[in-house]
From Swiss-Prot:
It catalyses: 5-[(5-phospho-1-deoxy-D-ribulos-1-ylimino)methylamino]-1-(5-phospho-beta-D-ribosyl)imidazole-4-carboxamide + L-glutamine = D-erythro-1-(imidazol-4-yl)glycerol 3-phosphate + 5-amino-1-(5-phospho-beta-D-ribosyl)imidazole-4-carboxamide + L-glutamate + H(+). It comes from Methanosphaera stadtmanae (strain ATCC 43021 / DSM 3091 / JCM 11832 / MCB-3). This is Imidazole glycerol phosphate synthase subunit HisF. The gene is hisF. Keywords: Amino-acid biosynthesis, Cytoplasm, Histidine biosynthesis, Lyase. InterPro entries: Aldolase_TIM (IPR013785), His_biosynth (IPR006062), HisF (IPR004651), IGPS_HisA/HisF (IPR050064), RibuloseP-bd_barrel (IPR011060). PANTHER family: IMIDAZOLE GLYCEROL PHOSPHATE SYNTHASE HISHF, IMIDAZOLE GLYCEROL PHOSPHATE SYNTHASE SUBUNIT HISF/H IGP SYNTHASE SUBUNIT HISF/H. The lineage of its organism: Archaea, Methanobacteriati, Methanobacteriota, Methanomada group, Methanobacteria. Heterodimer of HisH and HisF. Belongs to the HisA/HisF family. Its EC number is 4.3.2.10. Gene3D superfamilies: Aldolase class I. The keyword Cytoplasm applies. One of its GO terms (cellular component) is cytoplasm. The keyword Flavoprotein does not apply.
Length: 274
């Protein structure tokens, strides 16, 4: 069995020199957490299996700023790096990989133009193409109400999962399960799956969402949104069937250091690199 991965996520505000890491609740209520290069170095030294940088400012004008951050990071950080936010064209993939990233994640641009996935995977390889899916529950009274959505029975009732774009500011009506399947068919190598309902809440991942996506694609799924303690990460693997768990605030604010989380998982017989 492949080892599960622990992935710190750095949401980067690049409107200031060198950038700063922030964290919100349900994509709002922003707190500042530190310098991206310094935090990435800290997490690498603690044993992070991968590090995700998300540019929340996501503008072409600041592409060079993110590239600078990545170039400085990889001078001392030797673990896989994924960059997301503002990845709109194949040339953006190329620029970030040239700066030192190993993967690029895109959400809005792929939904607006799904062929981007085909073109990017052909140009840089599927292993470098991560699709971010930011999903929110939409409840229905009757599972037969909609033929166009993948309906899931949860503890709170029947629902489907709606894909959002533009950092959660706009909903598309696109079913997240069907979209994940299409992304894999087009050449995506991984899904970065965030629950908008759980983001920053620390009440645990949306396990129904994670499990449903994981069972419908064969590529790795990264669970994101809602982790508050090591047990939540354990649940993402044991119940949610995720391949990796992404977390932010529990690491940024030193609530649960990465070594503590990994030792907890090891004691629970989860295959993990120590």
């Amino acid at each position: 069995m492949l080892s599960k991965r622990i992935i710190p996520c750095l949401d980067c505000d690049l409107q200031v020199p060198e950038g700063r890491v922030v964290k919100g609740v349900e994509f709002k209520q922003i707190r500042y957490a530190g310098n991206p290069v310094e935090l990435a170095t800290k997490y690498y030294e603690q044993g992070a299996d991968e590090i995700v940088f998300l540019d929340i400012t996501a503008s072409h004008e600041r592409r060079s700023t993110m590239a600078d951050v990545i170039e400085k990071t990889v001078e001392n950080v030797f673990t896989p790096i994924c960059v997301g936010g503002g990845i709109r064209e194949v040339k953006d993939y190329v620029a970030m990989l040239k700066a030192g990233a190993d993967k690029c994640s895109t959400n809005t641009a792929a939904i607006k133009d799904p062929s981007l996935i085909n073109r990017a995977s052909e140009h840089v390889g599927s292993q470098a193409c991560v699709i971010g899916i930011d999903a929110k529950r939409r409840y229905v009274e009757n599972p037969s109400e909609s033929d166009e959505h993948y309906i899931v029975e949860t503890n709170d009732g029947y629902c489907w999962f709606d894909c959002s774009i533009y950092g959660g500011r706009e909903f598309t009506g696109i079913d997240a399960v069907k979209w994940a399947i299409e992304c894999e068919e087009r050449g995506a190598g991984e899904i970065l799956l965030t629950s908008m309902d759980r983001d920053g809440t620390k009440i645990g991942y949306d396990l129904e969402l994670t499990k449903t996506i994981s069972e419908n694609v064969s590529i790795p799924v990264i669970a994101s949104g809602g982790v508050g303690n090591p047990e939540h990460i354990y649940d993402s693997f044991s119940k949610g069937k995720a391949d990796a768990a992404l977390a932010a605030s529990i690491f940024h604010f030193d609530e649960y250091p990465i070594p503590q989380v990994k030792n907890y998982l090891k004691d629970k017989n989860i295959p993990i690199r120590i």
